[in-house]
């Protein structure tokens, strides 16, 4: 029960042939086959492409000056004037 037997598949095939006709159905199957063939060809062409060049190395940071550390003198210079006046 609920399984599809061979007679069910024959009935489905006959109904499809009636709706689409013999010519349209074979044309559709031919188009599907051409699509699969071109897809396989496209996939095989992707495999033969040469690998990309390696990316350029990142610049080294050893020659760049370091930012000043947050000392109390630097922090005091960065405090806005209205806060300084309120203390």
UniProtKB/Swiss-Prot annotation:
Question: Topologically, how does it sit relative to the membrane?
Answer: Single-pass membrane protein
Q: Which GO terms describe its molecular function?
A: protein transmembrane transporter activity
Biased composition range(s): Polar residues: 69-87
Q: Which domain of life is it from?
A: Bacteria
Any single GO BP term: protein transport by the Tat complex
Where does the UniProt annotation locate this protein?
Answer: Cell inner membrane
Keywords tagged on the record: Cell inner membrane, Cell membrane, Membrane, Protein transport, Translocation, Transmembrane, Transmembrane helix, Transport
Residue spans crossing the bilayer: 1-21
| Renumbered residue ranges of the record's region Disordered | 40-87
InterPro entries, alphabetized: TatA/B/E (IPR003369), TatA/E (IPR006312)
**A GO cellular-component term linked to this record:** TAT protein transport complex
Function summary: Part of the twin-arginine translocation (Tat) system that transports large folded proteins containing a characteristic twin-arginine motif in their signal peptide across membranes. TatA could form the protein-conducting channel of the Tat system.
The family annotation for this protein states: Belongs to the TatA/E family.
**Oligomeric form and interacting partners:** The Tat system comprises two distinct complexes: a TatABC complex, containing multiple copies of TatA, TatB and TatC subunits, and a separate TatA complex, containing only TatA subunits. Substrates initially bind to the TatABC complex, which probably triggers association of the separate TatA complex to form the active translocon.
Kindly provide the name given to this protein in its UniProt entry. Answer: Sec-independent protein translocase protein TatA
Question: What would be the name of the gene that encodes this protein?
Answer: tatA
